[in-house]
A protein has these predicted regions:
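Conserved DEDDh/DEDDy metal-dependent 3′-5′ exonuclease domain
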Residues: 39-112, 120-122, 131-149
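Conserved pre-motif I regulatory segment
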Residues: 270-324
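Conserved helix/coil segment N-terminal to the catalytic DExD/H
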Residues: 311, 315, 338, 363, ...
Length: 411
């Protein structure tokens, strides 16, 4: 196979060719393409001429390489190549997609500097219609990802064991299997080894009851990547990191698994996670430093209404809470919002026409040491608005207070 020189310590890189296509979105036709090997002296194919001839040359160029790699190659490049000619169907046998790997390798904010993590995940190449540049950039991103996985394997081998199992369940997983085996120095783990790794990885970080039911679904191959993304986000939960929007869109089960594991109160006293993280009083103490809710107003059984409202909201119930002025209405939404952000990364949107009230809410939380609330209203300057929206996109905001007219803006 030796088309590429063995210049890397990672065998998988030496056995790969990077492909990038430029496609006319209206006609769904390829108008330019590039294929490159890892080292700069390796043969490369670049074409923006007769595409039929270029496709034939591309097919010949890829012979001898075990893997085709690319950024969004699974959902973009390979389908277009297969549509152009059936001879390219074989390329999909063992591809490696750097888009799919990036949330696992770089889940924490700041994310990889070349990937638009908080948007659609595309590369920040700075070049327009330059497939050769983008194809070479993919090697740079992949090498960074492998380096991150190697470090993860050193500090948390259970995480990489879990990823190796979860990401290699489909018929197209040969490339990912080669990559993880290369980094781990071991073949793909079996289901029991993966189960043990995930159990240890999530111990104390999720509800033990929900973890048991989730582990029972490990044989469901459709949940492989979603579960990997859920594990990756949970590893950085409680900070300012977000699950990429494209992951939530393409792998919706990932967010569902996070909610199931971290935002459901099982009610079992033996579950240390739920005792700590799903208890309204402990949440009140954590965020605002108070041991108890206000005793008044109370319901007919003497239970503080503040606590009842917070408890219902933390349990995900729909509710209407009405309290007199000066009885602490704000914490009735702030505690559930902060708790949910901490547990699942969810953003709570509060719609209010009162700009002064927004500022008062943010200042009140700031006095309690909470800096994760932002406002968007017509009184902000453009730099202030941009800063607020950036905090939302990057995962710095738990609560967004926004005026109704701002909802008309597409930004």
């Amino acid at each position: 196979m030796n088309k590429a020189a063995n210049i890397s310590r990672w065998d998988v890189l030496c056995r790969s060719v990077s492909i990038d296509l430029e496609v006319d979105p209206e006609k769904a036709k390829i108008f330019a393409l590039a294929a490159v090997a890892q080292d700069s002296d390796a043969p490369k194919l670049v074409a923006n001429r007769n595409i039929d001839t270029a496709l034939t040359e591309l097919d010949e160029f890829c012979q001898g390489y075990e893997h085709v790699i690319g950024h969004n190659i699974l959902r973009h490049d390979l389908p277009h190549l297969a549509a152009a000619s059936p001879r390219f169907v074989a390329l999909a046998e063992a591809p490696i997609d750097t888009l799919w790997l990036n949330p696992l390798a770089f889940p924490r904010n700041p994310y990889h500097h070349l990937v638009k993590h908080y948007q659609d995940g595309r590369l920040q190449s700075g070049h327009v219609n330059d497939p050769e540049f983008d194809a070479r950039l993919v090697f740079e991103v992949l090498e960074d990802q492998i380096g991150a996985f190697a470090e993860l394997n050193r500090i948390s081998p259970d995480a990489l064991t879990a990823y190796h199992f979860l990401c290699c369940r489909s018929a197209q997983s040969g490339g990912f299997d080669h990559l993880f085996a290369d980094v781990r120095g071991s073949t793909k783990p079996g289901i029991e080894e993966a189960r043990g790794a995930i159990q240890r990885l999530l111990d104390g970080a999720v509800c033990s009851t929900m973890l048991s039911s989730t582990l029972a679904q490990l044989d469901d191959t459709s949940l492989g990547w979603p579960m990997a993304y859920a594990l990756s986000w949970i590893s950085v939960a409680g900070g300012d990191s977000v699950m990429p929007p494209w992951v939530r869109a393409q792998f919706s089960d990932a967010a569902r698994i996070v909610r199931k594991l971290r935002d459901n109160n099982c009610g079992d006293d033996s579950c240390s996670y739920c005792r700590t993280n799903n208890d309204p009083k402990k949440a009140l103490d954590r965020w605002f430093g108070f041991k108890d809710f206000r005793p008044e107003p109370a319901d007919e059984f003497g239970r503080p209404l503040q606590e009842l409202i917070v408890s219902s909201a933390m349990n995900g119930e729909s509710l209407l809470g009405i309290l007199p002025t000066g009885t602490g209405k704000s914490i009735c939404y702030q505690i559930p919002a902060l708790s949910r952000f901490d547990k699942t990364g969810a953003l709570t949107v509060v719609i209010s026409p009162l700009v002064a009230l927004m500022a008062d809410q943010v200042q009140g939380m700031a006095r309690a040491g909470i800096a994760s609330a932002v406002t968007v209203n017509g009184m902000l300057s453009l730099p202030e608005r941009h800063d607020a929206l950036d905090k939302v996109r990057l995962g710095d905001a738990a609560i967004l207070l926004i005026s109704p007219e701002q909802l008309r803006s597409v930004s």
